[in-house]
Amino acid sequence: MLKAHKYKDFDWVLVGTAAAIFIVGLLFLFSAMYSKNIDFIIRQIAWFLIGALFFIAIININYRKIISLGYVFYFLSLILLLIVFFFGSKRLGAQRWLELGYFNLQPSEFAKLFITLSLIQYLTEHKTEKVVKNIVTAFFIMLVPFVLILAQPDLGTALMLVPVFFVLLYIWGVRLKRLFFIIGGCLAASPLGWFLLKDYQKERLMVFMNPDIDPLGAGYTVIQSRIAIGSGGVFGKGWLSGTQNQLNFLTERHTDFIFSVAGEEWGFAGGAVLLALYYILVRRAFEIARKTDDPCGVLAACGMATIIGIQVIVNISMTMGFMPVVGLPLPLVSYGGSSLLVTMIALGILE
C-alpha cells in the first residue's frame, strides 16, 4: 500500500476488485466479439498478463522512486506523442497508434499516467508559498502534452488531464476559492476551443444535444447504445442474447461502448454490480490516500484514483447519452492493451 512492498500488507480488496472487474469485462468482450473475431479475447488476456508482470515489478519498488522519475516519464511521453504524430497509424480519422507487429500502442494512454506522475513530482518538490508561480508552471507542464494529444485528435484523453490537474492542485493545498476562479476562467475560455475541434468532433457535440439530427451518421452509435441499455430492463436479455449486440447494431461495442453490451444483456442489475465494483475500487484508492502520512503518497493515490474514476464516469455517461462521445475506454473492461496496461501500472502504484 504505497510503500516498498511486503506481501503480508498486500491489499487484497484492491486487487480482488480489479480482478473481478477484468473477469466481468472478459465476459462482455466475449459476447461482443465471439461471432466476429475471437483474437480480441486472446489479445486482451495477453495484455493482462503483460500488465500483471508490470504490476508485480512495481509493487516491489518504493513509489517514491517512481515519482522521482516523473520528469523522465514526462519527456518520454512527449517523445512518444511526437513519434505518433509523424509515424502513427490512422483510424477513424485519428492518428493515435503505433503499430508493433501483433500489437498496437496508444501513446496518449501512457501520457495521461506519465503526465500525472510528473505533476506529482513537481508539486511534491515545491511548497505552497509561491502558489501562483507553481500553479502556472504546473499548468504548462500539462499544456504541452495536452496540445499534442488534442492534435491527434484525441479529445477524450486530452480532457482527462484537466480533472487530474485540478484534483492534484486541491490535494496539494490550493484553496477552493482559487480553484473555482481558475475553473471559471477555463470555462469562460472554452468556447474558443470550438475552433480547434475537427469536424467529426463538432458533429459529436451537436448530436449530444440531439442525436436525432443525424440518426444514421454521427448520432447512430449513441442512439443504438441507448436502445440497447434501455431494452435490457432490470435483469437483461441474458449473456450472448443481446439483439442490438449480436445483430451488429452496436458499433465500437468491444471498446468505448462495451457498457452498452452489459446494459442490454445483464440489465440494470448487472450494470449496478459493475458500478459497485468500480465504486469499491476507487473508494479503496482514496482510503489508501487518507491513511498515508506522506504528501507524495497522498498525491499519488489521489492521482491514480482520479484517472480511473473519471474514465468510468465519462465512459458510462457517454454510452447513455449524458455526455458527448469522446472516445474514452472503460478501465479493465474495454478492449485495448494500452488502456489495460496503464490501469495495471496505476494499480501497482496504489498497491
Question: Which sequence ranges carry the predicted segments?
Answer:
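A juxtamembrane structural motif centered on a specific transmembrane helix
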Residues: 1-2, 29, 311-351
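Hydrophobic alpha-helical transmembrane segments of multi-pass inner membrane proteins, especially
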Residues: 15-221, 260-320, 345
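Glycine/serine-rich anion-binding loops at beta->alpha junctions
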Residues: 101-111, 151-153, 233-237, 328-342
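Transmembrane helix boundary and interhelical junction motifs in multipass membrane proteins
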Residues: 154-159, 237-242, 253-255, 272, ...
